[in-house]
Amino acid sequence: AVEAXKTYVRDKPI
C-alpha cells in the first residue's frame, strides 16, 4: 500500500 507518498510493506512504514 502507498500513503502520503511513502512506500509501505504489509501496512508498515519502511
Swiss-Prot record:
GO CC terms of this entry: mitochondrion
Compartmental location: Mitochondrion
Domain of life per record: Eukaryota
GO molecular function list: GTP binding; GTPase activity; magnesium ion binding; translation elongation factor activity
Assigned keywords, A-Z: Elongation factor, GTP-binding, Hydrolase, Magnesium, Metal-binding, Mitochondrion, Nucleotide-binding, Protein biosynthesis
Annotated GO biological process: translational elongation
The reaction(s) this protein catalyses: GTP + H2O = GDP + phosphate + H(+)
EC number: 3.6.5.3
Keyword set includes rRNA processing: no
Principal subcellular localisation of the protein: mitochondrion
Family assignment from sequence similarity: Belongs to the GTP-binding elongation factor family. EF-Tu/EF-1A subfamily.
Described purpose of this protein according to its UniProt entry: GTP hydrolase that promotes the GTP-dependent binding of aminoacyl-tRNA to the A-site of ribosomes during protein biosynthesis.
The protein's name: Elongation factor Tu, mitochondrial
Species this chain originates from: Canis lupus familiaris (Dog)
Gene: TUFM
